[in-house]
Amino acid sequence: MQNSLLKPRIIEVEVLGAGHAKVVMEPFERGYGHTLGNALRRVLLSSMVGYAPTEVTIAGVVHEYSSLDGVQEDVVDLLLNLKGVVFKLHNRDDVTLTLKKDGEGAVLASDIELPHDVELVNPDHVIAHLTAGGKLDMQIKVEKGRGYVPGNVRRLSEDTNKTIGRIILDASFSPVRRVSYAVESARVEQRTDLDKLVINIETNGVISPEEAIRQSARVLVDQLNVFAALEGTEAPADAPSRAPAVDPILLRPVDDLELTVRSANCLKAENIYYIGDLIQRSENELLKTPNLGRKSLNEIKEVLASRGLTLGMKLENWPPAGLEK
């Protein structure tokens, strides 16, 4: 009788496109496909290190609801386009970059002035369009981070030297755009009750899908090593209690779920602004929402399921302090 657990012996990587791959691993003991697949998926979405614009200062702009003469896009659209620029920093945690452009035409990511240790993954990305006589002058701060951090959490209200016109951005640092997993049947000799784990992952190009999986596995190993070296210790009597940390995925706005306009508007009408707000609602509660029918409900359930979430979940630490509606 064999008492040791099986470890995957077959690992296949199928490249599906730039930054997109399917990774297949088998065999696993029954149940381990879901155990490891879900753990890897959650770490991939929440804990990978990446880079994102976090602050912007634009000449002639006081706040994000302004508009600029000679620029086709308003400031809100310009900032959304800027968030689509993919940066990669080498040997530094933050950098402030300059973008200056005048004259009619498109403003591209490649127009940003870069030092030698900053790289652009998508230099052809369009940031704005200038009309005749238009001009754009901006300072962009790019930082290293993990997951998703809303701007209202990052805002430094105690900063007395704050520059007028500095705009704090919601920062999506994660280099992983999408990840899903499936568990299929596998067979080894006479055993047919084994698992095959299939992970479909897409990144923004800062890291490869294979490297993303390697990094997520290291994060899990590092966390589980604490349990492997578990020793009983008595906690200090006066140790302050801490509120449990909130999963960064729950802090993302419902707009990040890429729902149809109808579904998104129905949710906002019910004051559901964040994914953490949404998952605490039951199916019956959502069906009572005006103009939200069964089709929209099924769409919401499918999108949540693709992220390992469901309706009707209970959160003890929601909403977290400082979260704005």
UniProtKB/Swiss-Prot annotation:
SUPFAM superfamilies noted in UniProt: C-terminal domain of RNA polymerase alpha subunit, Insert subdomain of RNA polymerase alpha subunit, RBP11-like subunits of RNA polymerase
InterPro entries per record: DNA-dir_RNA_pol_insert, DNA-dir_RNA_pol_RpoA/D/Rpb3, DNA-dir_RpoA, RBP11-like, RNAP_asu_C, RNApol_insert_sf
Domain of life: Bacteria
Subunit structure: Homodimer. The RNAP catalytic core consists of 2 alpha, 1 beta, 1 beta' and 1 omega subunit. When a sigma factor is associated with the core the holoenzyme is formed, which can initiate transcription.
Entry function: DNA-dependent RNA polymerase catalyzes the transcription of DNA into RNA using the four ribonucleoside triphosphates as substrates.
Source organism per UniProt: Janthinobacterium sp. (strain Marseille)
Gene name linked to the record: rpoA
EC number: 2.7.7.6
Keyword Nucleotidyltransferase applies: yes
Name of this protein: DNA-directed RNA polymerase subunit alpha
